[in-house]
Amino acid sequence: MDPSPNTNEALTETRFSDLKPPLSEDIIEALLRSGPPGFEFCTPVQAATIPLLCSHKDVAVDAATGSGKTLAFVLPLVEILRRSTSYPPKPHQVMGVIISPTRELSTQIYNVAQPFVSTLPNVNSVLLVGGRDVRADMNTIEEEGCNVLIGTPGRLSDIMERMDILDYRNLEILILDEADRLLEMGFQNQVNSIISRLPKQRRTGLFSATQTEGVEELAKAGLRNPVRVEVRAESKSASLTNSKIPSGLHLEYLVCEADKKSSQLVDLLVRNKNKKLIVYFMTCASVDYWGLVLSKIPALKSISLIPIHGDKKQNARDKALASFTKASSGVLLCTDVAARGLDIPGIDYVVQYDPPQDPKMFNHRVGRTARLGKEGRSIVFLLPEEEDYVEFMRRRGVFCQEKKCSEEASDVIPIIRSLAMKDRAVYEKGKRAFVSFVHGYKEHECSYILRWQSLEIGKLAMGYGLLHVPSMSEVKQKRLSSEGFSPVEGVLKFEDIKFKDKSKEKQRKQNLQAKKEKLEDKKRERDKKNSKKAVNASSATADSKKRKLTGKQRQTIQTAEDEEEMARDYRLLKKLKKGSIEEDDFAKLTGADDF
């Protein structure tokens, strides 16, 4: 029988120790050791799901972001392995597989699972994600063995295909986390490949924040008579039918001109300097730029600013997330790479500096705060021409309250421009971020509301603190107006702006010199070709004129040319006698070397 929807409360009155079938004492002790006091009690999704999986039922779980889904499948996995007839397993006998869409989420699941998997003697779990050498993973598996695979679809399917040593015949449980995201990111083929290698006699748990046709099809193909678990968490300011938003979340929007956005952002960060915030930008280049610029603004010096996006190397992303997770306050600057699944504790505020390209990501972004029943706030910055986005979200069941611009916000544009004039890194990253934003804006799924043709490009460039509006086809072709941009007074030539990093500046100068020499070579080659063409044209013209002259006129011209040639040879002969030129040069110039 399907369990009925749970209440809005973050925690139920059900203790983990009261669940039936009962969890082992090792698990209960690990729960009390690894979590806050709340780990004594279950969240609704945990109370509903754990008994079902432990009773050998397949489940399709539709639950809110931040509802405690990870423990809802990690604990049953450990218990099922403990009770398996194949326990303890052989070193390369795989008994459990957990698939998630991103490296960060997989890493987080692995870290959550470790304290509980460690209660099983002779059971080893391994994390398999991209961004590192696959051969290193294979060597680890061969040497240490693995019984639980946790990772992303690409790396998991790759390892499965390469390693015949792995035995799946006694696999007990498969977990598909963030199933909707797995499909959205194009992992359908890899997921199917993984499932095809596993025995049909297994338990399967499918967890998803949204229900789509693709998820339903995946559930039909991968689950057997699943019990559907639906946990609702209605927000005070939002209610969705296709995606859940945490309770206790207060949603706001702020409308301001493009040239005021950065100042409003800095003001908001200063006012919340003792809190933990996530700020979302549209592009990787924007994260790079604002991560650099904001860290240099005096008012933000005391705030820890940590940028992360999909183009960063995996090690750098892992370190950044670990640093932010441990911190009690600070700001994570990111793209949507961190919008799903990451369980970062204690997020107080989510700021969407740019509306997401995919409107579904709005809910996943704001779901980083107000987790497990706590209070949280979220705000989305909108340009005046984007205000229809509020009504668009309202029709999707998301209700945001308007927040007025802070009249006390200091103008940070002069500071940013000053930074750009002193460091080419700021200057170039600013241009790159600006161009990437405009191009990204053109790809909006809500293009009928967020129209790139309506962007006030001049004000936007001011908001980025740029020294000039970058050269773009959209501006050149007059499709976007650069009105509202104020040139910097007394600015030096832009090509003279230097990198503060001496090695980068040295490389830049070398590149400039090489470019200059290349241009000069091209110019000489072009001049040579043009000169040759001119001589040929002149000769052809002269010949044509000669043919039109009388015999006497042609004879007169020829005599003059001969006299000029004799005079030139005489001048060269005098230079030869004085030693001004060598004999070889004289021979070449007079044509004597032809004889």
What are these regions (language model features)?
Residues 340-355, 377-380:
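A short beta-strand element within the Helicase C-terminal
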Residues 1-20, 25-26, 32-35, 84-93, ...:
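Intrinsically disordered, low-complexity, charged terminal tails and linkers of eukaryotic nucleolar
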Residues 228-238, 254-259, 353-356, 379-384, ...:
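Conserved AAA+ ATPase "SRH/arginine-finger" region at the nucleotide-binding site
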Residues 2-275, 282-285, 292-303:
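SF2 DExD/H RNA helicase N-terminal ATP-binding lobe
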Residues 366-410:
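Conserved segment of the helicase C-terminal RecA-like domain
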Residues 135-140, 288-295, 301-339:
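Conserved helicase ATPase core of P-loop NTP-dependent helicases/translocases
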Residues 106-108, 135-139, 157-158, 213-218, ...:
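Switch/connector loops and helix/strand junctions flanking conserved nucleotide-binding motifs
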Residues 151, 334, 352:
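Short beta-strand and adjacent tight-turn residues that come in two discontinuous sequence segments
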